[in-house]
Amino acid sequence: MWPTSVEALRFYHTFAFSPGRRRRLFGLSIVFVIAALCVTSCDADAVPAPSPEAEPSLGAGANPYLLDSLVKRLPKKGDKKEILISYLAAVPTLMGEIDQYLLNLSASNSAQNSSKDRESFSKKLNQIVHCLTTDAYVSVVSGALVAAIVEINQDKDLIPAYQLKYVFGNTCGNDSHSTRLFMEHWQAGARVFIGPEKNCKTEAAMAASQNLPIISYRCNDQDISRDDYHYRTFARTVPPAGEIFKAFMSLMKQYNWRKFSVVYDVKKGQVKNELFETLKRMVETENKFEEHKFEIMNVSKLEFSKMDISSQQDIQSIENAIKSTMQTTRIYLTFDNVRLFRTMLSIMGEMGLTQQDYMLIYVDTNYDWLNVYHSMNNHFLRNTMTYLHHSWDANNSSDRKMLDYARSALSIIPTPVKLNSQRFYNFWKKAGDYMHHFGVQKADNLKGNRIACYLYDAVYLYAKAIHELVEEYGNDDSYDPTADGKAIIDRIVNKKYRSIQGFDMRIDERGNSKGNFSLLSWQKVAPIMNKSDPSYYPLDHALDLTAIFVEAPDKDRLPNLQFKSSRIQWLKGEPPPDEPVCGFHGENCRKKGIFSYLTVVVMILIAVFSLVLTGFTLNYIRSRRFEKELSMIWKIDPYEVRRVVGGVNNESTASLMQSDVMQFAKTKTPWWSKAPVQGTGMRGLASYKGTLVGLKDLMYGRKPKDLTREAKKELRAMRQLAHPNVNNFLGIIVCQYSVTVVREYCSKGSLHDILRNENLKLDHMYVASFVDDLVKGMVYIHDSELKMHGNLKSTNCLITSRWTLQIADFGLRELREGIMYDSSYNIWENFLWTAPEAMTINGSLAISNPPTPKADAYSFGIIFHEIFTREGPYKIYVQRGDVNGEAAPKKDSVECRALVEKTVRRVYSDPYFRPDTSDLEVQNYVKEVMAACWHHDPYQRPEFKTIKNKLKPLFHQIYKQNIMDHMVLMMEKYQTQLEDLVDERTIELKDEQRRSQHLLQRMLPSSVAEQLLAGQDVIPEAFPPVTIYFSDIVGFTTISGESTPMEVVTFLNKLYTLFDSIIRRYDVYKVETIGDAYMVVSGVPQYKTMEYHAEQIAMMAIHILSAVRSFSIPHRSCEPLMIRIGMHTGPCVAGVVGKTMPRYTLFGDTVNTASRMESNGEALRIHCSSSTQKVLTSIDQGFLLEERGSLAIKGKGQMTTYWLNGRAGYEFTETIEDKMVVPDIFPRPNLKNRGSSWGVNRESSLSLATEKSSQIMKRQSAAMNRNNQDVIYYNQPLNSGGFTSRGTSNREMPKLYEEDRESLLNQSASLLGSRTSGRKKSTASKYNGFSASRMFSSTISNASSSRPSRPSTFDHDTLALRKRSTSLPDGEKLNLEFIETTNLANNSVPAIPNNISSLEPVFRKASIIDGYSSQSESPSQSQYPSYRDLTTGPHQRKRGIATVFPVRKRSLSCGDAVPLKINENGASGSITTAVSPRSSCRALDPTMKLAARASSPDEIIFQEDDEDALIDNDSLLTSNGNSKSEDVLRTCPQPRRKNKHSFLRDPSPLAKRFRDASPFGKKKPFWNSNKSNEHTSSPADSISRLFRRFRGGSVNEYADLNHYCDDEDESGRANGYEMQEMGKMTGRQREQRNGSRTNRSVSCSPDECGTLTDSSDPHLTIPSSSIGDSSASTSLSCS
C-alpha cells in the first residue's frame, strides 16, 4: 500500500534529520514532501495502457466505470449504451515505494560508489525531479472525474439509456505523449475528450476533425476559440487566465481610476508576460469605448534571486521600482505573486505611502484558500516562516504592521468555493475516496482544489448536453447524439450553469468560461482568540470579501461591481484620486500669464469681424429657426419615455381605467428598440417627463420613409393645437419598423368603451355633454391649419378624468399610408365610421382615399347615432334583437366579423344604406341632424358650426349645469351614505387597536409595554440581586421522539398553561419558554427586596412541583411527568432585544448559574445555589433546605448547593387556572369576511348601511368612547328549555339587579317545566334569533348579596350589539367564576317570567346534514332586534329581559351546561344546549350523536363491539351501577387500527363541550366502574368530587375542562376511560336505536332519601354516602 502524504512527511522528518543526512537532504526537503504524492509508474518513452489487474478497487469491488480494454466491445441486448470518456492528465510519477527511494538515496555515496552507481543515483534523482515538473495536484483532482461519472450513472433522470465509462492516459506533461494517447483512445471508441491540462491546441484540432467534443478543465491557451473553424468542438470550464483582468478594469472604472502602474516578476516569464499582454489588449479595447482613456504609466518587470523574495537585493529592486514611479502614479497593480504583493505593501507602508492617496491592487488568479483566517495566516499578510503567536501577538511585529498597511490595499480573486454547501462537501469527500484510482492516498488535511470542480463541471455539462440531444431527437435510431460534437458543444456554450463550487458560471459563445470573481478589502471580522485553533487570529480586521463582480447585461462589456452588506473602508472616507488635483507636477494649477500684445490684437480683430457678421447671422438665424422648429418640434427622444409594464387597477366608479400603482420597465434595453410583431394598435401607457402619456404604434412592413416637408408642417400644426376638447399631440418616436405616436393620457378610455360598458348609466346630462364636447372640438380642428380630422370615430374620442371628451388621432395623413394591421377584421372595422367617398374597395382589399371635411361630418353622424343606441355603428355590437332585418351576432365572434365586412361593403355599394333611426326615442331634430350628416351627397352635409346651432336644444341643460357639477351632487350623496360605514369601521379599528395593546402587554412587562406604546426607547437596566428560576422536562427528547408533533404541542400547551396559572399568584415575571425550558424571574422589572423576590420564586417553585406531581401527559396518561428545577440569586441586566418580535430578556452570569442549577439537578427536586439558600435562611419563613454538598459546576468550578424540600405548614391543592379577566386579544377568524355587523348588506363589505342601522352605529360610536360602562345583555327563554342569546358585546355571564330578582323568583317554577315541554312555533316573534349559528342557553345564577342598582331609565349609550357568539377552541379554558360556592347548593336560581314569548329562531337558508343545520355565516338584517323594541320598560321588555353584567373572556355556546336549582325544597336539574334542526341550540337530546370526522391514516380506531358497548348505556350497567365487561372499560386501552369502523374522536370542539359540561368527569362516563382498579367511581362519587372542588374554592379559578384523565380525589388519581360520542345518524335512526329515551332530570338531598333511583331507569342507583356535603343538593342529567 502506498503511504499517504502524512506518512511520507513523518518518515521524512525521522529520516532527514538523522546524523549524516541533513546536509544531503536539506535542499531536497520540499522534494520529498511533494514526492509523497508521486505513486504510479510512467516511463518517459512509453506509457502503457491501464491494466485491469493493476487497477485499484472502487470501494469493496472493482471500478465498474474504467474501460477494461482498449478493444471495442459489442453491446449485449438490453444493455445500456456506453459512452467512453478519454481522460488525459499529467499525473506525477515515481517508480517503487517512496520510503525505499529515500533509503536508497540515503545509502548512496557518490564518493564511495562506482560510476555506474552514481549514474543510477542520478537517474532516480532525475525521476523525482521529473515528478515535480508535472502538476502534482492533478492526481489530487482526478478523483472528481470518477465522482462525476458515478453520480451521472446513478441518476435515473439523466441520460438513462447511456452509461459513462472512462479510459485514462497519463501524458506525463509531454505533448507527444498526449497526442499519441489521444489517437489510441479515439481508436478505442472514445466519444468525448476531457483534458489535457496545459497545451491542448493539437488535441482540439484533432477532435474537431472527427466532430467529437473536447472539454478542457485546465487548458489556458488563449489562441483556442470556437470562432476558429479548426476548434469548433472545443469548450473549457476553466476561465482563461486573463479573464480576471475584466474585473480589474471594472474596479478601475467604478472609482474613475484611469492611470496606473504595473509591477510583476518574470520568474515564470512566459506565463506572466502573457497575462500582461492580455491586460494591455483589454486596456486598448476599453479605450475604444471610453472618453477618458486608461493609461499604463509605468511597467516594472522584476526578476528575483529567491522564491520567497527574502534577499536584500530583491527587496531593493522592489523599492527602486516604487521610488521611480511614485511621482507619476497613485495606483499600483501586481498579480500572481503574493510574496511580491506583501513585500510591496510593506515597503509602501514604511515609506508612508499607505497613509497617503496611494493604492495597491493585487490580482490573484490561483487563490484557493478556505476562509478569511486561513488566507490571512497562510497567504496574504503573515510571514509563514514564523509562528502564529509570534505574528499577531507582538504589537510591533511585521505582520501586525502589514494589517495596518492593508487599508490601502485591494485584492481581486476567484470567488472562493462555498464550503458550507452540503453538495460540495459530499462531492469532495467522494473525489477524495476515488483518488486511489490514480495512485494517490488522500490525506486527512488535504484541502479542496478548484481544478477538481472544473473537472467535475466538464463531465456534468457533457452529460446534460447529451441528455438534451436525446430528448430533442427522441427515438431516432438513425441519429447518434454522441457522435455530433458540434451539436453537443452548441448546447453547452452561451448558457449559465450551476457549478459544483456553489455559484453560477457561464460559457460564452467562444467556448470560454466567464469565471466568477470577488473583491477583498480591509473589513472588520470576528477575532479567534483560542491559540490552539489552527485558525488563530486575534485581530478584528482582515482582508475580507466585500463585493462580487456580476456579469453585465451586455455580455461583451465589463462586469458590474455588486457590494455586499458593507462598503470599502477607505482611509480618508472616500476613494483616492488616481492623480493629484493639480497633477503630479502641478501642471493643472499653473497661473496664466498676462495676455501678450499679439493676443490682444487678435481678440480685437475677432470682435470686429463678429460685428460685421452679426447682420448676416441674424438674418440666417431667422430663416433657419423655422426649419429647425419644423423638424424638431414633433420629435421625442425615446430615452425620455418609460413604458408602464404593470399596475393595480382601481375599479371604483371614480376611476374606471386608472392604475393606482404603476410599474415601469427596469431593463436597460430600450423598449422601443424591440420591434413588435403585432400590427398597428395601442401600445399602452408611459411616463414622459414625469407625466403619464398614451402611446399608439403605427407598424410598417418596411422601414418608414423619410418625412416630407408637408408632413413636417402637419406635425407642427398638430403640435400647436390647444383646446379643451382636443387631445394634446406631444410628438412621435421614429423606430426601425414603426412610428409611435405620443399623446396626452385620458384615464377614462374612449367614448366607444364608455358606450359599451353596460354598468354605466348615462343620463341626458352625460349624452349632451359628450356631444357638445365633440362638436366644439371638431369646430376648432376645422378652423385650424389641419382643416379636417380624417380619422374620426368613437374609439378616437377619449374621456378624461373630469369626464371631458377630447378628440385624438387626427392628422398624420402620410404616416398612415402603408401601415399594417393585426388582421383584416381590424381594417374593415375602421371603415365603419368612414364615408363612402373616403374609401375604395378593390376585391378583398379596402383602401382609404384622401380625407375631406365633409367626410368628418359623415363620421360625426355615425358617432351621434352610436351615442344614443349604445350598440355600436349600425348596431353591430347589439347583443340581441335584429339589426336591419338580420340577427345581430355577439361581438368578436366569427359572425360579427363577417357582418362588419358585409356592412362596410354595403355602405360602399349602396349610397342610401344608413343606420336605422326608426326605433330611436329621441326628438325629431336629433334624427334630422343624423340624416343630414350622413347624406349621400357630401356637398349637402352641414358644417360643424351649423350642426352646433341645430343641436342647441340638446345643450340647453348643460349650459346651466356642467357635467362636473352633476357628478359632485352624486358624490355628495354617496359620501353621506359612506359616513355610516366609516363609523362602523372605526369601531372595528378601535377594537383591533385594543387587542394589539393587550397582546403587547402580555408579551412584555406592563411598564416596558407602556414605554414602547409611548414611542420611547427601553434603556437596559442593571438590577441588584434577583432570583431566577429554570426548569425543564426530564426525558423530553424521548417523549418528543415517540410522539407526533401535534401531541407534543398539545402536551406543552397544557403544561405551560398550568405553569402560567400558578405564576400569576406570585410577584414574578415569565421571561421565556424555549422548547421544554421554562424561565421565570422575580425582581425584574419592579424591584423590591432581595429577600422578598427569593421567597416568591421559592414558593412558586414549590407550588409548581406540587402541581406537576398530579399532572399527566395527555397522550401518555400512565406515565408520570418529571421536571428539574434550579434557582439562583444574583445581579443581572435586563432590556428589550430586537425590533421585530421584541423580547424582554435577562443577561448576566446569574442567568447562566441558574441554568446550571437546573441542569445539575434531579427529577422532581428543587436545586438551589448557596446564595439563594442564604437568602431563604435569613428570612426564616420555614423553608426546608437540605445541603447537597460540593458539586462541580461547568464554568463555575466547585459549588456548594442545596435541595429545597418545601415550606413548613404549606400544602397546595390541585391547581385550577386563576380567576382573571383575560383580555380578548385574538381576533375572530371570520372578522375580515363577515361584512358589516350592524344590520347592513352582508354580501359586500363596501355596501352602505341603512338609515336605521346608521343611527345605531352613531350611538355605538359614542358609547365606545366611554369607559367602565355597564352593557345591556338580552336573552330569551325557549319553549323547550334553555335561553337564547339576544346579543351583547360583553364577555361575561349575567348578574342581576336587585330590583329584577324578586320578579324572576316568583316565576322560576316555570323554567324546569318548560325544559321538557315540546317546542312551539313562535308566532309573536318578529325577529330571528340574534345569531343563528352561535346560540347558547344559560342559567342565571343568583348574584351575591351586594348587587348594583339597575338604572331606573334606559340609557341609549348602554346598548351594544354583537354579531356572533364565539365558541371555545380546543385547549382554551372556560371562565366559570359566575358559579358561587354558597349559592350553588343553598340558594335558589331565578327563572325567566313565563309570560314572555319564546323567540325560537326561524330556520333560514340552511342545509340539513344528519340532523345538523348549516347556516349562512352572514345573518340577514331581520335577525337583529329593533332598537326601539329593546327599550320598552325597565322590568319586562317587549321581547326579552335586560340584565347588566361585567366583561368576561368568552360567551357560552352550544354544549355548555351549568347545574341550577329552583328553590331549597324543589327539584334541581341542569340546562344544556345542543344542535337542533330548527335552531342552532336547544336542550340536550340524549339520543343525539355527533357526526364523526373523516379518518386519517394515523388516527386510533376501536372495535365495533367497543363502539356498541360505549353507546348502548343499558348494556353496560348492572343493578348496582357496575360494569358488565372488564374488556370494554379499560383504564388505558391499547388502540387497535382498523379502517372499516367510525373513529371514536371528537368531530368538533362542540362535542368536547357536551362532554366537558358533565359534572361526572371529563373523560370517564358516570357508570364507569372498573373492578380491577383500586378506586372505583359512581355517579355520586363524581358529584362528590365536583362539590369538593367548589368548597375548596377552585370554582373561582379557570376550570380545566380539557384534562385527559378524571379528577383527582383525596385518596389519589382515579383511572378513567374516555367516553366519546360518534356516528352519523338522523333523528329517526337515533330514536329506533335508543327507544323512547328522554332527557331525565332527577335530584335528591340526604335528608329526603338514602338512595335515589330513577323509576324510568332501574339500572341507576346513587348511594347517599357518596354525597360530600349534607347541605348540597345533587344535580344530575342522565343520557
UniProtKB/Swiss-Prot annotation:
The catalytic activity of this protein is classed by the Enzyme Commission as: 4.6.1.2
Spell out the InterPro entries in the cross-references: A/G_cyclase, A/G_cyclase_CS, ANF_lig-bd_rcpt, Cyclic_nucleotide_synthase, Kinase-like_dom_sf, Nucleotide_cyclase, Peripla_BP_I, Prot_kinase_dom
Protein's membrane topology: Single-pass type I membrane protein
PROSITE patterns per UniProt: GUANYLATE_CYCLASE_1 (PS00452), GUANYLATE_CYCLASE_2 (PS50125), PROTEIN_KINASE_DOM (PS50011)
Q: Where is the composition biased (Polar residues)?
A: 1567-1580, 1635-1644
The answer to whether UniProt assigns keyword GTP-binding to this entry is: yes
- Locate the transmembrane regions by residue number: 593-613
Which residues are involved in binding ATP? 645-653, 696
Q: Is NAD among this UniProt entry's keywords? A: no
Chief place of localization: membrane
Residue positions binding Mg(2+) 1: 1032, 1076
What residue spans carry the region label Disordered? 1412-1434, 1534-1580, 1623-1679
List the glycosylation sites: 104, 113, 174, 298, 395, 516, 530
Q: Where do the annotations place Mg(2+) 2 binding?
A: 1032-1033, 1076
Any coiled-coil ranges, and where? 961-997
What does the domain comment read? The protein kinase domain is predicted to be catalytically inactive.
Could you tell me what this protein does? Guanylate cyclase involved in the production of the second messenger cGMP. Acts upstream of cGMP-dependent protein kinase egl-4, most likely by providing cGMP to the kinase in chemosensory neurons to regulate body size.
Which PANTHER family did the record assign? GUANYLATE CYCLASE 32E (PTHR11920:SF501), GUANYLYL CYCLASE (PTHR11920)
Family named by the database record: Belongs to the adenylyl cyclase class-4/guanylyl cyclase family.
Protein name as annotated: Receptor-type guanylate cyclase gcy-12
Q: Supply the source organism for this entry.
A: Caenorhabditis elegans
The lineage is: Eukaryota, Metazoa, Ecdysozoa, Nematoda, Chromadorea
